[in-house]
């Protein structure tokens, strides 16, 4: 069986959209958000992700900036695929993207928004949330949080019982 990694990443800290005139979808990362992205990218680069790597990203500016920053830290940077349905996605939509991933993909990185992206990480982690390794997830899913799941299942069979939460990365 083939080892696969599923990476669930919430975008880094974004500025408020109040009074900006641009609306929610165009909110950029803050200076702190750019620092968070650099830290997560450096940690992700140490994981030696099995390829090919497939990246799905919401069209929101803050997720695109998160993707660009994180992927620039990887030796073989993947090009993010912008998926409009990731913006405002629910849990079923996120599982749909995972299940539709081509079988030759060894690492899938989903970059999205709360509440759905955090709900997905919590759903997949299940009882692992009780361990000290995942203490950071007990009180929400903070910006730039990335959870790594391992599996040997085909993407279409991904569910809480077929993955193992291996680590959580925070800036």
Question: What role is predicted for each listed range?
Answer:
Residues 95-101:
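Short, surface-exposed amphipathic charged segments that create phosphate/polyanion-binding patches used
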Residues 47-50, 101-106:
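Glycine-rich phosphate-binding loop signature in dinucleotide/nucleotide-binding domains
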Residues 105-125:
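A glycine-rich beta-strand to alpha-helix segment
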Residues 125-163, 170:
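Domain-level recognition of soluble alpha/beta enzyme cores
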Residues 21, 72, 100, 138-139, ...:
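Short secondary-structure boundary/capping segments
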Residues 6, 106-109, 146:
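Residue-level preference for the first positions of well-ordered beta-strands
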Residues 2-89, 93, 126-131, 141:
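Active-site-proximal alpha-helix that buttresses catalytic centers in soluble enzyme cores
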């Amino acid at each position: 069986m083939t080892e696969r990694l599923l990476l669930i990443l919430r975008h880094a800290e974004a500025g408020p959209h109040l009074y900006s005139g641009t609306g929610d979808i165009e909110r950029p990362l803050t200076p702190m958000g750019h620092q968070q992205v650099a830290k997560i990218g450096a940690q992700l680069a140490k994981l030696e992700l099995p390829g090919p790597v497939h990246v799905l990203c919401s069209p929101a500016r803050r997720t695109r900036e998160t993707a660009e920053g994180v992927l620039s830290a990887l030796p073989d940077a993947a090009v993010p695929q912008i998926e409009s349905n990731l913006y405002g996605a629910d849990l079923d939509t996120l599982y749909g993207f995972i299940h539709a991933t081509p079988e030759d993909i060894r690492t899938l990185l989903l970059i999205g928004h709360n509440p759905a992206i955090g709900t997905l990480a919590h759903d997949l982690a299940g009882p692992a949330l009780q361990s000290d390794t995942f203490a950071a997830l007990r009180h929400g899913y903070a910006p730039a949080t990335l959870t790594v799941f391992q599996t040997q299942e085909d993407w279409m069979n991904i569910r809480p019982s077929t993955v193992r939460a291996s680590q959580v990365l925070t800036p």
